[in-house]
Amino acid sequence: MADALADAAPLLTFPSGDAFCAARLFLPSLASRNLPCVVLANGFSGTMDWIVPDFAARFADAGIAALVFDYRHLGQSPGEPRQLVDVRRQREDLRAAIAFCRRHPALDPGRIALWGTSLGGSHVVEVAAADSGIAAVVCNMPALDALRGANVQAKLARAGMGRAPLARTSLRLLAAALWDAVRGAYDAAPRYLAVYGDPGRAFFTDPALAERFRAAEAGAPTWRNRVAARFLLQAPRYRAGTLGRMAAPVLFTLADDDVEVSAAFIRDVAAESPRSEVREYPGGHFDLYHGARFEEVAADQAAFLRRVLLAEGRPT
């Protein structure tokens, strides 16, 4: 994967906050100046060698440049402590990525779109709502709200877990998050939780996902199966009306059997904007990243971006 990425899109950097972010820019094969571009914001713990390159390549094939990047503290970007998922800093990184694209000589600053998946979906909604220059937004199974937007009932049913075991597991995770926050205040080494693993010790615990995460570790050399536990104390919350403030058209692509993100909650949010489109696909949260379902979703997203960014009469 690393060699293929280097061939498709050489490594570059852009400044962000107190450091920089590593990134790769996928260009259409018939690259020219004044290209539209989509900035891809990966999900929880995600690095730019996992999930996002596949979507970026499809968008480049459709004539749209695509920027993938590593948030600070993850992957090839600097930042200590490592494996820190900080919502505020990640949104700062996303804004820095947009600024980089607007300055790039090959890209059209008036045709910058955002794409976000899972946690990245929350980032792109918040950033686009405050930036009227964003031309289009794609939200792929967006984790907009860690409480109201979580599909708790479906997750309980899938795990065969009652509310009491869930409460005990949640308390263990909360204790880890609080301890990690205390350690962070004293610049001590983080208390890590696994991204995928056993209940009470990891964020994702569904045994059906084991093969997905084994494949991630094998195919994405910079991804790590751990995150600083303090993330739980700042997981995203959606403020009603945010989507209604967004000037850009937005496409929501959802999985109808998603036990992580509530499709019903996302449909309610989408109703805030008359420029929203919602499409649902069979499968779970991670199914839309793989196989035939991925091809269908990526094709629909590329068609939406082409319709908005390559509209007749616009320069290409």
Task: Indicate residue ranges for each PLM-predicted region.
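Conserved alpha/beta-hydrolase
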Residues: 58-78
